[in-house]
């Protein structure tokens, strides 16, 4: 009996322990859920704070851009002093320009700059691209899609470097590594004596002005032709309508116009006779004034 009571006590203790463990686990789960909720709420708060910071930053950036634009408008360009102007003119006099009449196919400006910079420092470089018609035709028939340049100009800081570059590269291979794409290509380059970069810009501006003038003249001629064509069409419509009305009237009146030829519709305008008071004019054109009867009566009484 004593053993049975002890077993029952142990069983009750085990049940109590199990209940305690269940309560502990439930409380653990609840604490985990609460922690998760707290973390979510903290994350939401952080996100809201970040959004507020972003909005604040965007407002600050907008204000800064507005202020910068205002400052840029208010900035007045300072005039060069005579000393600075003289230095700039000396720099321009030292520069030399080379003309490239033939450029290797599909060579980019960066590659050309790296090739020519072996002879000296390069300031400006301009390459003339090919026409759009030739490019589209080449691509249409399965050609290369890269850009191709037909001519170019290069400005060296020192004219001695420009002369050296033109003397060594003109009509010769580019060379370099045999595996390079432009190893066997030939460049035609010429040094332009007494030619500066602003001369090139002036020439391009003149060409653009001439092109614009030609285009405007062609447009005006085309507009005149269109106007004359429209006027002729309107006149022909008007004449056709007049002829149709005349035919309708004649059909109503029952006149027989089978033998009569159709006369052209012309307007009869009243015109004054030509007259002239010049001495060398013809007698038919001279203006002959009618004699005044009252004046003749007075003169007859006097004399």
Curated annotation (Swiss-Prot):
Its main location: nucleus. Residues 96-186 form the RRM domain. One of its GO terms (biological process) is small-subunit processome assembly. One of its GO terms (molecular function) is RNA binding. Keywords: Nucleus, Ribosome biogenesis, RNA-binding, rRNA processing. Residues 1-25, 243-303 are annotated as: Disordered. The keyword Oxidoreductase does not apply. It is found in: Nucleus, Nucleolus. Residues 258-267, 284-296 have a biased composition (Basic and acidic residues). Residues 1-21 have a biased composition (Acidic residues). One of its GO terms (cellular component) is nucleolus. PANTHER family: ACTIVATOR OF BASAL TRANSCRIPTION 1. Belongs to the ESF2/ABP1 family. Involved in the small subunit (SSU) processome assembly and function, and in the 18S rRNA synthesis. Required for the early cleavages at sites A0, A1 and A2. This is Pre-rRNA-processing protein ESF2. It comes from Debaryomyces hansenii (strain ATCC 36239 / CBS 767 / BCRC 21394 / JCM 1990 / NBRC 0083 / IGC 2968).
